[in-house]
């Protein structure tokens, strides 16, 4: 039975706030402060979240970062991360493990997220007006601790549908994320 392998942890949807990056989180960008970074300390560690070919990633996993005051209380890898920056939804990590401790790669890079590479995508065209569209559910903004929980899988599906509309060239990956979320919903209704 195929379903035996399904992760038993319930699906959790987390909207996580990250520092803006005009290079789509594929390399360091200097736009956040308007001047060059001084030393390794100030580089936002999320700068490489969507540098999928970075040698630090494996064939199937991408290593990313989000700054949490305290990490979300989730187990396993049945977690969707919806990345949020400057009021916009900018991308997704699917089937993500969230580590309790940040792991340093070198003095510039570290990670606390391990996501499934073929369920991870940055949106060339970002989603804005997210509160008006109901994408934050009842929240007025993403929590000060760096993230908030979204409670309804339908919210994620609605966000992904808009992402596909705005980014048809990323439809394959976005549909895969949707399929995964929808398969989780069927699990819980059995």
PLM-predicted stretches and their roles:
Residues 2-43, 102-190:
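Contiguous surface segments at macromolecular interaction interfaces
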